[in-house]
């Protein structure tokens, strides 16, 4: 499911939750941007496509990105499920965002094994072999440090 997390920014962080070694991690979900079209998929960067479209010409349309390099450890106190149910009182913009998030979530569910495997691989490469993966290490957050910080505030 999609979840949101409070941040210092004006909007919450939106992402999916996975388990890595018993620790919950949020993988940030980024809205589609033009710059993503020419970027190649990498171990820490997963493109989300509109595969549910009835129109084949849209099946390769990028509708979001999962940034594994920016996944963060979280605890239950900061996780809240996002309501994606369409409501007749929603504004047109809110309806459009919900439909996009429904498509993104559907794609993530269909590709959950790949997402989990890649996230675990990125985590392992950064925490176990940082010197062998310097470019990846530069792009990624420090998972160990973030886990230590979270443990100071965590009660679950």
Tell where the protein language model's regions lie, with residue ranges.
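Short, small-residue-biased leader/transition segments that mark boundaries at the very start
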Residues: 2-10
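General N-terminal targeting signals
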Residues: 10, 34, 41-43, 83-91
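Conserved catalytic-core segments centered on acid/base and nucleophilic motifs
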Residues: 13-19
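Compact nucleic-acid interaction/catalytic patches
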Residues: 19-62
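C-terminal terminal-subdomain/extension
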Residues: 49-156
């Amino acid at each position: 499911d999609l979840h949101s997390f409070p941040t210092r920014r004006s909007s919450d962080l939106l992402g999916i939750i996975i388990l890595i070694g018993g620790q919950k991690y949020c993988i940030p979900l980024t809205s589609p941007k033009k710059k993503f079209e020419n970027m190649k998929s990498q171990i820490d960067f997963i493109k989300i496509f509109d595969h549910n479209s009835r129109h084949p010409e849209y099946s390769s349309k990028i509708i979001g990105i999962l940034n594994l390099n920016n996944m963060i450890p979280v605890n239950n106190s900061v996780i809240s499920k996002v309501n994606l149910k369409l409501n007749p009182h929603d504004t047109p913009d809110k309806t459009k965002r919900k439909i996009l998030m429904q498509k993104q979530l559907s794609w993530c569910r269909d590709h959950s094994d790949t997402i989990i495997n890649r996230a675990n691989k990125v985590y392992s490469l950064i925490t176990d072999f940082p010197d062998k993966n310097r470019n990846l290490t530069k792009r990624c957050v420090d998972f160990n440090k973030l886990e230590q910080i979270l443990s100071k505030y965590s009660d679950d």
